[in-house]
Amino acid sequence: MHEHLKEKLAILPDQPGCYLMKDKQGTVIYVGKAKVLKNRVRSYFTGSHDGKTLRLVGEIVDFEYIVTSSNLEALILELNLIKKYDPKYNIQLKDDKTYPFIKITAEKQPRLLITRNVKKDKGKYFGPYPNAQSAHETKKLLDRMYPLRKCTNMPDKVCLYYHMGQCLAPCVKEVTEEQNKEIVDEIIKFLNGGHKEVRSELEIKMYEASEKLEFERAKELRDQIAHIDAIMEKQKMIMSDLVDRDVFGYAVDKGWMCVQVFFVRKGKLIERDVSMFPIYDEPEEGFLTFIGQFYENSSHFKPKEIVVPGSIDSELVERFLEVEATQPKRGKKKDLVELANKNAKIALEEKFYLIERDEERTIKAVDHLGKQLGIETPYRIEAFDNSNIQGTNPVSAMIAFIDGKPAKKEYRKYKIKTVQGPDDYESMREVVRRRYTRALKENSPLPDLIIIDGGKGHLAAASDILENELGLYIPMAGLVKDDKHKTSHLIIGVPPEPVMLERNSQEFYLLQRIQDEVHRFAITFHRQLHGKSVIQSALDDIPGIGDKRKKVLLKHFGSLKKMKEASIEEFVEAGMPKNVAETIYTYLTDKKTL
């Protein structure tokens, strides 16, 4: 531990507040809150921890703290600090997990819509629904029963919905505000749990229509009743008071937390939300951070009541979220909390089973590879491969594996710029120089291990640039192939020594995946460039086709094969003048030319 950390730990206050952990670049990597700052912050640097917390602690070189006047103030401040710094070790709930709602618009002639984008407008929203199908089934039923406007714009004549009796045609007829209000009130009553009353009213109308011998109308009403029964049968009633509530449960194991939320609407359990994330705080603190972020998501309405497990301070939740929070001791609510807890525990068990299987292939394989090479665990591996088939369009590619998995956003492609002809060694020197010069300039992460797809010459070329030109000392290994071009072994060190791996070991399989992936990425890039050059050379002799039109054709068609299959009209659609389109078509279909 750094000496200045010991000094700062010694003077921590025993008051509530937030703390900000920083790495060697001064970047905030974790934000936490505590009832007693002194106890919580010191706990990171004492005692035993799980692997994830050890990794966090291993990156901490400094920290700051902010004292607050209460736990509630610390909770609010923590959420704001997380939003401000976006620390990599904090929970970051995604905003893309949204549920569908039925919306009654606030337009003069209102409409019914399905939306996942809940806005603070004057529209009325009902939901969330468990899935899009459920929402669409309910809307379809309401469309049949209540003739609100269906069209987005006002057409100048009536549409099919009017003739089907599902629209009052405000586009050509006067529909008063009172008429719309009556329909909207009926829809609201239905969506607020009054479907039984609506069903009874429809049943009465059906019998009246039968007595008047209006059998077509009676059949239509009977079908509407059947649709109501079918939809409502799918939603099981679990609470009789019809209160909208969210029921929370959680489980913690091996440094991970799972939170399950049951959405109860109008007495029915309609959906659940499952979130899993690493936790570095006490479970209660982690849960409070989660629930704060949960309701910041625009798709999560605060219900009338929130039900939390017994270990959570419900009064703090109530003050924090400004909504009624309960901690049930018995009854159906307690049963639901226990069910949510149980589901959370099962979800974690399943996750760890899958993690164990995945880790054998990834992080454990990475750890074993590091031990075989005599280096620290290479959490980030970058691999290079050249491709210059037939000496044309020489390229190189770099891929990255983080924790044993491909990190495709980190992949890079390189056109060889300074090397004339097929020279693998010089190409490798150029690419390594470009990659790590830029990494140093942009202060981007450096790898723990570099793998060069090649033998001693490739390794020597890359090492020379890395160490003698750039002053970087990163472990580097050459990936040697056998006579069948398959992974054989690694070479490392000066002079390079072979490192033989068990062929049925996970670290060997990891190297095979890296080799296959970097080769695939390089060869795909090479083929793309080669394909472009083939098209361009095929177009060189066509009158009226310059560089600009070549690029347009290449972008539009993508391949010479598609161009040869295209009609004159398709060349015109691509932006070619009619006479040029005819020239291209004639040239490409001339068998003597191609």
From Swiss-Prot:
- GO molecular function, one example? DNA binding
Q: Keyword annotations for this protein? A: Cytoplasm, DNA damage, DNA excision, DNA repair, Excision nuclease, SOS response
Q: Name one Pfam family in it.
A: UvrC_RNaseH
Instruction: Describe the location of the GIY-YIG domain by residue ranges.
Output: 14-91
Question: What SMART domains does the record tag this protein with?
Answer: GIYc
CDD domains per the UniProt record, alphabetical: GIY-YIG_UvrC_Cho
InterPro entries from the UniProt entry: GIY-YIG_endonuc, GIY-YIG_endonuc_sf, GIY-YIG_UvrC_Cho, RuvA_2-like, UVR_dom, UVR_dom_sf, UvrABC_protein_C, UvrC
State where it is primarily located: cytoplasm
Cellular location of this protein?
Cytoplasm
Q: Which domain of life is it from?
A: Bacteria
Q: Which GO terms describe its cellular component?
A: cytoplasm; excinuclease repair complex
Signal sequence: where? none
Residues covered by the UVR domain: 196-231
Q: What is one Gene Ontology biological process annotated in the Swiss-Prot or TrEMBL record? A: nucleotide-excision repair
**Is Cytoplasm included in the keywords of this UniProt record?**
yes
The UniProt subunit note reads as follows:
Interacts with UvrB in an incision complex.
Q: What does this protein do?
A: The UvrABC repair system catalyzes the recognition and processing of DNA lesions. UvrC both incises the 5' and 3' sides of the lesion. The N-terminal half is responsible for the 3' incision and the C-terminal half is responsible for the 5' incision.
Q: What does the sequence similarity comment in the record state about its family?
A: Belongs to the UvrC family.
Query: Which protein is depicted?
Result: UvrABC system protein C
What is the scientific name of the source organism?
Bacillus cereus (strain B4264)
